[in-house]
């Protein structure tokens, strides 16, 4: 009944990259993919920049997944060890052992209930921030304490939005002031907000 939990502080998500090809860097590459900002101006997202953003997030998710896998293996080894220990016990020892295990299971159920409640709250906070609230992300930010979970949600939301903002700034600097295909003014009546731009680029999702 043990459940994998990823316990970590997402403050490192806020670190700004020095890679010139990542959002916030100084890379200047072409082949743009255009989107609009909230002023109705088309924003250029180069494939290289989008690839870098995706790689950063994927690496960090993979890192936490690896930790979760290692945690699961440790728990499996502990379970095998306990089974071998139980096989060597006499009746009284087994009764005492089983009683202790039952108490642990009850405590685990209480912890799981609390964890599920925190997952629901974390998903709500991510949705309100217009950030991806999938099970994978929720499992990354949720810990066994409400305070740390809230801190993780805020750090993750801010980091993703910062990456999008930096990409917008970089593309604005790279685009020519007049003419060209990479930076044009739009006259559409319905501007896209930050979340809509990011959602189309697979960074922020509903």
UniProtKB/Swiss-Prot annotation:
<protein>
    <recommendedName>
        <fullName>Capsid assembly scaffolding protein</fullName>
    </recommendedName>
</protein>
<dbReference type="GO" id="GO:0052170">
    <property type="term" value="P:symbiont-mediated suppression of host innate immune response"/>
</dbReference>
<keyword id="KW-0945">Host-virus interaction</keyword>
<comment type="function">
    <text>Scaffolding protein involved in icosahedric procapsid assembly. Coassembles with capsid protein(s) to form the procapsid. The scaffolding protein is found within the capsid as a series of concentric shells. During DNA packaging, the scaffolding protein molecules are released from the procapsid.</text>
</comment>
<feature type="region of interest" description="Disordered">
    <location>
        <begin position="83"/>
        <end position="134"/>
    </location>
</feature>
<feature type="compositionally biased region" description="Basic and acidic residues">
    <location>
        <begin position="83"/>
        <end position="127"/>
    </location>
</feature>
<keyword id="KW-0426">Late protein</keyword>
<feature type="region of interest" description="Disordered">
    <location>
        <begin position="173"/>
        <end position="206"/>
    </location>
</feature>
<dbReference type="Pfam" id="PF14265">
    <property type="entry name" value="DUF4355"/>
</dbReference>
<keyword id="KW-0118">Viral capsid assembly</keyword>
<comment type="subunit">
    <text>Found in the procapsid with the major capsid protein in a 2:1 capsid protein:scaffold protein molecular ratio.</text>
</comment>
<keyword id="KW-0899">Viral immunoevasion</keyword>
<feature type="compositionally biased region" description="Basic and acidic residues">
    <location>
        <begin position="25"/>
        <end position="38"/>
    </location>
</feature>
<feature type="region of interest" description="Disordered">
    <location>
        <begin position="1"/>
        <end position="50"/>
    </location>
</feature>
<keyword id="KW-1188">Viral release from host cell</keyword>
<feature type="propeptide">
    <location>
        <begin position="1"/>
        <end position="13"/>
    </location>
</feature>
<dbReference type="GO" id="GO:0046806">
    <property type="term" value="C:viral scaffold"/>
</dbReference>
<feature type="region of interest" description="Helix-and-hook motif">
    <location>
        <begin position="186"/>
        <end position="206"/>
    </location>
</feature>
<dbReference type="InterPro" id="IPR025580">
    <property type="entry name" value="Gp46"/>
</dbReference>
<keyword id="KW-1090">Inhibition of host innate immune response by virus</keyword>
<feature type="compositionally biased region" description="Polar residues">
    <location>
        <begin position="173"/>
        <end position="192"/>
    </location>
</feature>
